[in-house]
Amino acid sequence: MRYGWLIVGVCGVLCALGARAVEARGSYLFSYFIGNGEDGLHLAASRDGLTWEALNGGQSFLKPEVGGKLMRDPCLCQGPDGTFHLVWTSSWGEQGIGLAHSKDLVTWSPQQFVPVMAHEPGAMNAWAPEILYDAGASQFVIYWSSTIKDRFPETIAAGGDRIGQTGVICNHRIYY
């Protein structure tokens, strides 16, 4: 059975299918994580966008295996061929993100660690990635948030997130 889902990332970002798919098929899918993300990918479905039901009995669809073995901030996007693409925060302090693919949201490709900030030696993290398909350019776009040590010092005084109990201030910027 085929489902037409509007994919919604944990931050509420609409990823890639557009309103026509919702009108035609009337379903929403929400990707989320529990706790610190050790449990993996969770999905919930809704017919109206207001009432949500956890799928798979609330159990994870995919356990994290790469990076720091976390799956935080999962974002799904369905490509034009019907394949689902998943990106996620895979650790608190590494320079990459997780990536996996699925045709049915049950069977997944091997997970990949994508070192998106390896070219920046001072990069402290790669968090909250989002993926979308740009139909006009016929390509996927992935963007995320990273802090690069000692970059943008003029805004550090404004504060920011702290990494755990280290006291290190994260001065995030968006990269793609």
Predicted segment positions?
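Bacterial N-terminal signal peptides
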Residues: 5-16
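Carbohydrate-active catalytic/glycan-binding domains of CAZyme proteins
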Residues: 19-176
